[in-house]
Amino acid sequence: MADSEEFRASSPPPPPPSSPSSGASSSSLSMPVSLGWRDPSRSPGPTVDPLEQVELQIGDAAFSLTKLLEATSAVSAQVEELALKCTENARFLKTWRDLLKEGYDSLKPDN
């Protein structure tokens, strides 16, 4: 059972079955179906604690945000490395330009 909890915590959250703007409205006060909660008066079987459901969704979101932060940090490091290489290349090209200009100027006849 611990394995299924680990798998559940590491997998991304499933999309909600329906959105609040789907046009389906209920005349009675019940828990939102779009969050995966069950209305005990409508369906038999075990109900999902809304707090537990929200905690699971927060955990899944935190996991996803952590992965996104790791990926962003990796890309940031690559961008910094690329910027350093571009700066080195610009310095190299400027040096060559200056050398070529000096060589060209030295070939001009003196007046």
Curated annotation (Swiss-Prot):
Q: Which cysteines are joined by disulfide bonds?
A: none
An example Gene Ontology CC term for this record: cytosol
Q: Does the keyword Cytoplasm apply?
A: yes
Chief localization:
cytoplasm
Q: Does the UniProt entry include the keyword Chloroplast?
A: no
Low complexity composition bias: residue spans: 20-34
| Any matching Pfam family | RCDG1
Q: Where is this region: Disordered?
A: 1-50
Q: Which domain of life is it from?
A: Eukaryota
Record key words, sorted = Cytoplasm
Q: State the name under which the record lists this protein.
A: Uncharacterized protein C4orf46 homolog
- Which locations, inside or outside the cell, does it occupy? Cytoplasm
